[in-house]
Amino acid sequence: MLKDKLQPFINRFEEINQLLMSSEITSDIKRMTDLSKEQSSIQPIVSKAKEYIKVLEDIEENKLMLDDPELGDLAKEELKELETRKPELEEEIKVLMIPKDPNDDRNIYLELRAGTGGDEAAIFVGDLFRAYLRYAENNGWKVEIMSSSDSESGGYKEIVILVKGDHVYSKLKFEGGTHRVQRVPATESQGRVHTSAITVAVMPEVDDVEIEINENDLKIDVMRASGNGGQSVNTTDSAVRITHIPSGIVVTNQDQKSQHKNKDRALKVLKAKLYEIEMEKKMEAEGATRKEQVGTGDRSGRIRTYNYPQNRISDHRINLTLYRLDYIMNDGLFGEVIDPLIADHQSKLIEANGL
């Protein structure tokens, strides 16, 4: 019974309240901080749990009054409202009881890279980047371009951005994968639809202490930064390319005029990429069930199609199709695609955890 599962949360919340008032805890800053964080994390569940228990009590109380000649009609009305609220609360509580993804509150690095389709793929990298930018603005997030490689035809061969704000990873973690675009290129005289693809990687921002990199594992090259067509964008050797020898990962940054800043940015992106690899290894070790629960963000999997002639966007993981591609891309309304993905993910987790 759900009520029985909720009581331990209420008990623990009240226990922490008592502990935080004791002199033994108030003199220990670390212990006090840890307890405060734990209390904050369970507070939403406790709040809903108390409301739920009150609803259950009110339902029983109103049932007893149904035959009362004076209060029967009022009890019937209240009972109707309470019976409607009960399942709503149950669903809200189940979502709150889902084990939390430790990365959900992190900022992210979002890497968009042109794949098959040449110029069209690069142009779509630019289009999708701008759509994410609008979605970020709608959520009050901040976006910083970490590195970019322009395409001569417009758009980007590759762009890496840092997205900062509340719940960034929790909302964008399902964007990792292959995004396919179908449209008529501006240069196509016959009006034929071309198909191209880009890949998106979502990497949580990590602290320096979480990923340690041995300097001996790095090969660092500096070079003259260049723009479209190879023209020099500044006259110093400020561009930095870092190769992580054990993994073979290569990160390049030339967006800043300072070599030191470019190296610092490249190292941050490298750490995020290495953290992503560690996450994948951990999921492999925990098995396919865990992989299904958290969503893999596998870059090789085609996750979504953007069909411009039909004004259609389709997410293949949940069989979602919307004929609002123009609004979603131009107004940053990615919530229309992302929210159903989150809801589907939550329902799978509720089932997997027996809630």
Swiss-Prot record:
Compartments (UniProt record): Cytoplasm
Broad class of the protein's primary localization: cytoplasm
UniProt keyword Protein biosynthesis, yes or no: yes
Similarity field: Belongs to the prokaryotic/mitochondrial release factor family.
N5-methylglutamine carried by residues: 231
Assigned keywords, A-Z: Cytoplasm, Methylation, Protein biosynthesis
Gene Ontology terms, MF aspect: translation release factor activity, codon specific
Summary of the function given for this chain in its UniProt record: Peptide chain release factor 1 directs the termination of translation in response to the peptide chain termination codons UAG and UAA.
Protein name as annotated: Peptide chain release factor 1
PTM text: Methylated by PrmC. Methylation increases the termination efficiency of RF1.
Residue ranges the record marks as coiled coil: none
InterPro entries with a match to the protein in the record: PCRF (IPR005139), Pep_chain_release_fac_I (IPR000352), Pep_chain_release_fac_I_sf (IPR045853), Prokaryotic/Mito_RF (IPR050057), RF-1 (IPR004373)
GO cellular component: cytoplasm
